[in-house]
């Protein structure tokens, strides 16, 4: 293995092509409802795409290139990753893993506080050396050309990467698919992974004889998610290739497919831009568009969706945000996590903790890993 420095580049020709496609979008009719119950409303889809074509700042590549990035071949696949070393000599190694529809961009606001707490008003004893890879088929990692790249194989690749960087003892953190990969990492490399911190504890609602009001609410939320919120995952887990033809060719389609999740999964007051700026939303959508990764990213659902809630035996920490997809109670979490050493319920935030509540997530990660330093 030999990591090579890497920078993200977006050409003017690529931007011009995107703008042309957006301006030529053939729109469907308006939805016959006055809410989001049928998906992204036409008016917002049109406004979002107008903004993307006319006044969006395409500088996400430059913001990402501020941090050291590399590519290396692991298990036959080119993997893109950020590797930000702390100025503190005793910093603790940590691998951060994003999910869908996220990317390594979501970590830009937490990299500084995690790697250099002294410069951000924190305790230098909490410093981390951070490695943040792009999942296979996501961002600037290669797209697998064969099956088999599920969460376990990805976890093994992450362990190989960490060892190649000289880290024989490290922690793992993630949300969404990052939570599944981080949990799997604790299982495949228990001799090196001291603990895993997750900001998505995907746990089946418990069936207790004495459920609390919060547990009953979680059960109802689970039922509602199954009824109205699983369409995207059913498609991605069964027909990712078919879906990809539309999303890879139509930026409006790609934007709508992702933006709807920033409404459904964030702590907002009815509109995604209550929780995230339009710039942030379009940054994340742009990663998928410019890397043409709609299809390859969806294949992770085909590979591993049935294994998302596998038992976790590694020392674990769970931070529960109130508008996340699942919000287990402590005893519900104990049904999946057999060595749960940190459990906190936060007052604000949703599925995208690093984007919505970066300061909160940093504090949670610092607190959990103090147990292992």
Where are these regions (language model features)?
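Conserved acidic catalytic loop of the alpha/beta-hydrolase fold
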Residues: 152-170
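Conserved HGGG/HGGXW glycine-rich cap/lid loop of the alpha/beta-hydrolase fold
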Residues: 87-140, 369
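Alpha/beta-hydrolase
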Residues: 1-16, 21-22, 26, 194-286
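C-terminal subdomain of alpha/beta-hydrolase-fold enzymes, centered on the catalytic histidine
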Residues: 236-373
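Glycine-rich "HGGG/HGxG" loop immediately N-terminal to the catalytic nucleophile
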Residues: 58-60, 122, 126, 135-149, ...
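Non-catalytic accessory segments flanking enzyme active sites
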Residues: 14-86, 90, 280, 289, ...
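Conserved hydrolase catalytic core segment
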Residues: 113-120, 127, 167-217
């Amino acid at each position: 293995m030999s990591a090579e420095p890497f920078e993200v580049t977006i050409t003017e020709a690529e931007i011009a092509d995107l703008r042309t496609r957006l301006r030529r979008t053939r729109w469907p009719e308006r939805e016959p409802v006055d809410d989001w119950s049928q998906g992204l409303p036409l008016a917002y889809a049109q406004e979002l795409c107008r903004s993307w074509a006319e006044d969006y700042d395409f500088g996400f590549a430059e913001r990402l290139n501020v941090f050291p990035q590399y590519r290396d071949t692991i298990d036959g696949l080119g993997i893109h990753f950020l590797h930000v070393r702390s100025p503190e000599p005793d910093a603790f190694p940590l691998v951060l893993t994003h999910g869908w529809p996220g990317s390594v961009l979501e970590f830009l606001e937490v990299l500084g506080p995690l790697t250099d707490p002294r410069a951000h008003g924190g305790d230098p004893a909490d410093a981390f050396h951070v490695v943040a890879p792009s999942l296979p088929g996501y961002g600037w990692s290669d797209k697998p050309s064969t099956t088999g790249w599920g969460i376990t194989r990805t976890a093994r690749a992450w362990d190989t990467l960490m060892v190649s960087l000289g880290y024989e003892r490290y922690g793992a953190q993630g949300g969404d698919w990052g939570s599944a990969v981080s949990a799997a990492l604790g299982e495949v490399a228990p001799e090196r992974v001291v603990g895993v911190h997750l900001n998505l504890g995907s746990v089946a609602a418990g069936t207790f004889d004495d459920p609390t009001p919060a547990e009953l609410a979680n059960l109802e939320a689970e039922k509602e998610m199954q009824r109205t919120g699983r369409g995207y995952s059913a498609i991605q887990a069964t027909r990712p290739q078919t879906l990809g033809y539309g999303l890879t060719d139509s930026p409006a389609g790609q934007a709508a497919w992702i933006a709807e999740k920033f409404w459904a999964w964030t702590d907002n007051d009815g509109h995604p831009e209550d929780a995230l700026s339009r710039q942030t939303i379009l940054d994340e959508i742009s990663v998928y568009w410019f890397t043409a990764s709609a299809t390859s990213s969806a294949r992770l659902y085909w590979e591993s969706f049935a294994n998302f809630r596998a038992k976790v035996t590694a020392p674990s920490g769970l931070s529960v945000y109130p508008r996340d997809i699942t919000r287990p109670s402590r005893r519900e979490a104990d049904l999946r996590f057999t060595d749960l050493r940190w459990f906190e319920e936060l007052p604000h935030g949703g599925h995208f903790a690093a984007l919505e509540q970066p300061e909160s997530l940093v504090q949670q990660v610092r607190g959990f890993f103090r147990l292992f330093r």
